[in-house]
C-alpha cells in the first residue's frame, strides 16, 4: 500500500508544475505591458497546439508527410514565391506575381514582350525581330499570306474616286458597269440638288438606245407545252423605231398641282337636281301662292293620275 501510494504521489508531482513557478510567471505578466502579454499568450497557445514531430515522422515518405500535414492543418512552404511540394514530395514551380494577377488582353501583350528591355532601348520592329517580341503577330502575318496566295484574282470595276463606295454585291450577280455608273450619277445629282446646287446630267443616249434594242431582240424560243407550235421572233431593221425621249432634268422644284390655276371651261355645267316643272320666281311674282300650297297641288295631281291608270305597284303617302 505504501509503495502504491508513493508511486501515485510521484506521478502527480511530476505531472503538475510547481506553484512557485506559476506565481513567478503571473508576477512577470503583471509588470509587462498589454501587448507583450498578448504576444506571450499567443506563443504559449502555438506551443500547446503544435503536434510533436518524432524522428519517425521525419523518416516518412513525401506522401505520408503530406497526409500528416493535411490532418493537422500544417502549411509548409507557405511563403511568397517559394517552391511548393506536391503530394508525392516533388518540387512544383512557383510563379512570382508581385503586382497581382494579370489576366486577359494585358497578359497576352506582356507574354510576347521580352523582359528586362525597356521600350526606349528596344530596336524598331521589322520582319526579323517581330518574331522575338510579338510571335502572335508573326503567326497572323503568315496566315494572311497563305490566304492571299490561295485566293483567286477577281475582276474589279474601275470607278471614279468620288463615287467609290463599298457595295456588297455577290460574285455571281453581274451587272453592266454603265448601269452602275448611271445610278451613281443620279444619286450624286439628287444629293447636290437637295442642297440647292444645279446639276447637268451627262447621259450617253447612244448606249441607252443600244441597251433598249438588245432588250427587245429575243432569241429563239421553243414552247415547253406538248403542242407543235413554234414561236419565232425575227428582227426587222427596216421598221422605224421610236426614239427614246429623255426627260430633261429639272433644275428647279416642280410646282404642286393644287397651286396651279385651273382653266375655266366656257361650257356651263348643268347642276344635278330635281326638275320642278315651273319657275319659282314667276310663281311668286304672279300669284300670292306659297310654295307649300303649290307642292300640295302637284301631289294631288300625281295621286289622281295614278288612280286613273288603275292599280300600280307604288303607293304615295301624303
Curated annotation (Swiss-Prot):
Phosphoserine carried by residues: 16, 23, 61, 118
Biased composition (Basic residues): 85-98
Covalent cross-link Glycyl lysine isopeptide (Lys-Gly) (interchain with G-Cter in SUMO1) as placed by the record, residue numbers: 140
Residues modified to N-acetylmethionine: 1
Region annotation (Disordered) ranges: 1-25, 79-100
Keywords recorded for this protein, A-Z: Acetylation, Isopeptide bond, mRNA transport, Nucleus, Phosphoprotein, RNA-binding, Transport, Ubl conjugation
Chain positions with Phosphothreonine modification: 14
One cellular-component annotation, GO: nucleolus
Glycyl lysine isopeptide (Lys-Gly) (interchain with G-Cter in SUMO2) cross-link, chain position(s): 261
Keyword RNA-binding listed: yes
Record localization: Nucleus, Nucleoplasm; Nucleus speckle
GO function term, MF aspect, one: mRNA binding
Motif UAP56-binding motif positions after renumbering to this chain: 26-44
Tissues/organs with expression: Expressed in a wide variety of cancer types.
Taxonomy, superkingdom: Eukaryota
Keyword Nucleotide-binding annotated: no
Biological processes per GO annotation: mRNA export from nucleus
SUBUNIT field: Interacts with CHTOP. Interacts with DDX39B/UAP56 and NXF1; interaction with DDX39B/UAP56 and NXF1 are mutually exclusive. Interacts with SSRP1; required for its recruitment to mRNAs.
PANTHER family: 40-2-3 PROTEIN-RELATED, UAP56-INTERACTING FACTOR
Family: Belongs to the UIF family.
Function: Required for mRNA export from the nucleus to the cytoplasm. Acts as an adapter that uses the DDX39B/UAP56-NFX1 pathway to ensure efficient mRNA export and delivering to the nuclear pore. Associates with spliced and unspliced mRNAs simultaneously with ALYREF/THOC4.
Name recorded for this polypeptide: UAP56-interacting factor
Organism: Homo sapiens
Amino acid at each position: 500500500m505504501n509503495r502504491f501510494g508513493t508511486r501515485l504521489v510521484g506521478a502527480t508531482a511530476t505531472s503538475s508544475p510547481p506553484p512557485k513557478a506559476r506565481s513567478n510567471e503571473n508576477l512577470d505578466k503583471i509588470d509587462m505591458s498589454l501587448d507583450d502579454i498578448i504576444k506571450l499568450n499567443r506563443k504559449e497557445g502555438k506551443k500547446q497546439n503544435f503536434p510533436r514531430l518524432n524522428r519517425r515522422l521525419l523518416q516518412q515518405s513525401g506522401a505520408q508527410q503530406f497526409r500528416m500535414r493535411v490532418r493537422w492543418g500544417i502549411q509548409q512552404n507557405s511563403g511568397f514565391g517559394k517552391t511548393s511540394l506536391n503530394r508525392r514530395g516533388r518540387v512544383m514551380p512557383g510563379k512570382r506575381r508581385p503586382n497581382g494577377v494579370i489576366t486577359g488582353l494585358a497578359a497576352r501583350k506582356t507574354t510576347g514582350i521580352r523582359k528586362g528591355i525597356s521600350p526606349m532601348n528596344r530596336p524598331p520592329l521589322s520582319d526579323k525581330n517581330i518574331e522575338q517580341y510579338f510571335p502572335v503577330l508573326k503567326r497572323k502575318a503568315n496566315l494572311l499570306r497563305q490566304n492571299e496566295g490561295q485566293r483567286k484574282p477577281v475582276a474589279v470595276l474601275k470607278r471614279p474616286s468620288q463615287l467609290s463606295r463599298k457595295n456588297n454585291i455577290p460574285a455571281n450577280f453581274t451587272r453592266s458597269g454603265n448601269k452602275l455608273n448611271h445610278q451613281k450619277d443620279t444619286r450624286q445629282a439628287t444629293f447636290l440638288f437637295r442642297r440647292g446646287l444645279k446639276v447637268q446630267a451627262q447621259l450617253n443616249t447612244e448606249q441607252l438606245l443600244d441597251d433598249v434594242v438588245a432588250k427587245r431582240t429575243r432569241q429563239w424560243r421553243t414552247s415547253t407545252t406538248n403542242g407543235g407550235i413554234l414561236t419565232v421572233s425575227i428582227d426587222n431593221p427596216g421598221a422605224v423605231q421610236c426614239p427614246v425621249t429623255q426627260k430633261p432634268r429639272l433644275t428647279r422644284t416642280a410646282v404642286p398641282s393644287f397651286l396651279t390655276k385651273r382653266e375655266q371651261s366656257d361650257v356651263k355645267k348643268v347642276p344635278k337636281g330635281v326638275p320642278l316643272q315651273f319657275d319659282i320666281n314667276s310663281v311668286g311674282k304672279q300669284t300670292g301662292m306659297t310654295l307649300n300650297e303649290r307642292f300640295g297641288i302637284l301631289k294631288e295631281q300625281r295621286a289622281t293620275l295614278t288612280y286613273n291608270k288603275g292599280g300600280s305597284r307604288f303607293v304615295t303617302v301624303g
